[in-house]
């Protein structure tokens, strides 16, 4: 059965800014997309916490630092300037997950497995601020299924934000709300993407798995 789509006809996606901009963010997952999303948020002036899993042994930040280094060395460049890169703070899920309680926007960009994403969002709900926007960067999984088991309040602040690779250069941000996503959350993300990230905005319907 297809999930009922949010009626987007009343949304003000291209109006002048009517929502506060994001100042801080956390990106969970430091693969190619996660690290470069973090880079472009830093380009827009945000303080960004980039987190990934800790390996079984050795430096607990080895995985996240590898992803961050790849973003800093990317060609074409992911960061506008070296100063922008200094706004990204790396960490790991074991030691630093509570940092997401400090941010305005939490973006999950872990591997495309439903079970892993659900586990991550359960942890996000435990630590995120009650007013934080929470999104997933999935390109293929149903957004509403990722949020299964979460509270109604969480679901109102949750949506899909599909960046295209490389995020700095591809000028499109696909926003995928669920039936439960609050319209003002969609508007806020769309306005920020358009005004601060330089994105054209497409609002897409969530689909069944």
Regions found by a protein language model. Name each.
Residues 169-176, 195-209:
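Conserved Rossmann-fold dehydrogenase catalytic segment
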Residues 19-24, 85, 103, 131:
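Phosphate-coordination loops involved in phosphoryl transfer and adenosine-cofactor binding
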Residues 38, 42-43:
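Gly/Ala-rich phosphate-binding loop of Rossmann-like dinucleotide-binding domains
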Residues 34-35:
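N-terminal Rossmann-fold NAD(P) dinucleotide-binding loop
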Residues 30-31:
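Glycine-rich Rossmann-fold phosphate-binding loop(s) that bind the pyrophosphate
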Residues 2-14, 47-104, 114-115, 119:
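Conserved N-terminal Rossmann-fold NAD(P) cofactor-binding segment
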Residues 24-27, 48:
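Conserved hydrophobic helix-helix packing surfaces used for dimerization/oligomerization
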Residues 113-193:
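Rossmann-fold NAD(P)-binding glycine/threonine-rich loop
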């Amino acid at each position: 059965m297809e999930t009922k789509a949010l009626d987007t006809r009343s949304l003000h996606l291209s109006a002048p800014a009517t929502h506060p901009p994001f100042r801080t963010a956390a990106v969970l997952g430091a693969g190619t997309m996660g690290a470069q999303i973090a880079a472009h948020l830093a380009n827009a002036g945000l303080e960004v916490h980039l987190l990934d899993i800790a390996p079984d042994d050795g430096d607990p930040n080895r995985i996240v630092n590898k992803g961050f280094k790849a973003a800093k060395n990317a060609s074409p460049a992911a960061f506008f300037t070296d100063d922008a890169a200094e706004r990204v703070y790396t960490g790991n899920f074991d030691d630093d997950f509570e940092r997401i309680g400090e941010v305005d926007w939490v973006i999950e960009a872990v591997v495309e497995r439903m079970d892993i994403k659900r586990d991550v969002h359960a942890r996000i709900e435990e630590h995120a601020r009650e007013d934080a926007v929470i999104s997933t960067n999935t390109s293929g999984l149903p957004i509403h299924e990722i949020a299964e088991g979460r509270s109604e309040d969480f679901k109102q602040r949750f949506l899909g934000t599909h960046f295209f690779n490389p995020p700095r250069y591809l000028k499109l941000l696909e926003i995928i709300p669920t039936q439960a996503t609050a319209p003002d959350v969609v508007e806020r993300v769309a306005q920020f993407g358009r005004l601060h990230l330089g994105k054209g905005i497409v609002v897409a319907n969530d689909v069944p798995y």
